[in-house]
Curated annotation (Swiss-Prot):
Record-level Gene Ontology MF annotations: mechanosensitive monoatomic ion channel activity
SUPFAM superfamilies: Gated mechanosensitive channel
Entry's family note: Belongs to the MscL family.
UniProt xrefs under Gene3D superfamilies: Large-conductance mechanosensitive channel, MscL, domain 1
Protein name: Large-conductance mechanosensitive channel
Gene label: mscL
Predominant cellular place of this UniProt entry's protein: membrane
HAMAP family xref list: MscL
Amino acid sequence: MSFIKEFREFAMRGNVVDLAVGVIIGAAFGKIVSSLVADIIMPPLGLLIGGIDFKQFAFTLREAQGDIPAVVMHYGVFIQNVFDFVIVAFAIFVAIKLINRLNRKKAEEPAAPPAPSKEEVLLGEIRDLLKEQNNRS
């Protein structure tokens, strides 16, 4: 089997394609969540606590000196990333909870009893014949 053919079979297997789709959708979902946090949640939250823009929260470790830029820790951006994480984690939690509930409902449905085997059918016929013989006597 050639290398290219093996690679094609690997790349087109169902679980690899599903994984690729999941990664692409996850990246798009991450952008949506980042926008939700940065553009929708943080502005009203900052307004509620006094018109604060969290992106501006920073701690300067060293001031700029000539051509050397300042060394700054932007902890406001970190706060936004924490909000991003919490929202993504909550969304995943809710999705998994729904999937588990659906799987539980499927598991609770009683399965149809299996069809009797040939031996069971023959034993049933023998039993019925013996009952008939006992009833005649």
